[in-house]
């Protein structure tokens, strides 16, 4: 899980979602997991 000020899709399988008011990226590739904060 990377915590970044701005999250972006890295590949085609990345999805940008909102959980509990936080913007997150989830992906099949676990290296692409990101959270804004």
From Swiss-Prot:
SUPFAM superfamilies: Ribosomal protein L36
Gene Ontology terms, MF aspect: structural constituent of ribosome
Record bears the keyword Transferase: no
Keywords: Ribonucleoprotein, Ribosomal protein
A UniProt-annotated Pfam family: Ribosomal_L36
Single Gene Ontology BP annotation: translation
GO CC, any one term: ribonucleoprotein complex
InterPro entries given in the database record: Ribosomal_bL36, Ribosomal_bL36_sp
Similarity comment: Belongs to the bacterial ribosomal protein bL36 family.
Name under which the protein is recorded: Large ribosomal subunit protein bL36
Organism: Acidothermus cellulolyticus (strain ATCC 43068 / DSM 8971 / 11B)
Name of the encoding gene: rpmJ
């Amino acid at each position: 899980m990377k915590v970044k000020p701005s999250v972006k899709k890295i590949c085609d399988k990345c999805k940008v979602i909102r959980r509990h008011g936080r913007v997150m990226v989830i992906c099949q590739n676990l290296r692409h997991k990101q959270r804004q904060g």
